[in-house]
Amino acid sequence: PAAAPANDPEGVELAYETVDWTPPEGARLSDAIYEEYALQSLRIPGAAPHPTKLVQSAAMASVAPPKPSYRPMLPADIRTRLSNAQLETVIYAGEAHVDHLAGAWMVDEHLDNVSAAAEDAASAVRFRRGFMLGDGTGAGKGRQSAGIILDNWLRGRRKAVWISKSDKLIEDAQRDWSALGMERLLVTPLSRFPQGAKITLTEGILFTTYATLRSDDRG
């Protein structure tokens, strides 16, 4: 079945405040391997703590992350759908994505060869910075990923690719996208299209696997 017409929620910039974090007076690096995780460089009014306990290494807990300035565009009720730790991820991902990597590049017509170019060269492109999410089990990486896509979606960037290790995990991706108030069928499997055929979607999240990307065109 085709995805129903999207009835998108209205996007609003997520309100938060940055804070100067200092370790508690008299605190010292503990002998423990892990410390309980808490937001250090920002506060998100109205956001709930994560429903399960999160931890981080004691060394990481002793240093606050840099203060962000990026404000994601998200539904007004997002605080009821994502925890403060998950919203923090969406903020820092956006902080990375608004910037570019150094240098300019030429990409060939097949999109598989890249070479350095002068920044003022005709047809030169720049690449956006990436963001690596290294959270472990229980942090809700699916919902965090969906939140990052939703931020872009509500800014008008309505095409995304979701790559996973198994095609069976599309149900998880659809669940996480739907949990943010979006139409689950907007997450469309690449397997719906013949290999090598043009993908005609005007908007949506194309779900595929690493194995599919490695396979040859059968056309």
Set out the residue ranges of the language-model regions.
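SF2 helicase/translocase NTPase motor core
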Residues: G11, Y16, W21-L29, A48-L82, ...
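Walker A/P-loop-proximal flanking segment of P-loop NTPase domains
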Residues: T80, E88, Y92
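Phosphate/ATP-binding catalytic cores across multiple sugar-kinase/actin-like superfamilies
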Residues: Y92-G103
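Motif I (Walker A/P-loop) of helicase-class P-loop NTPases
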Residues: A139-D151
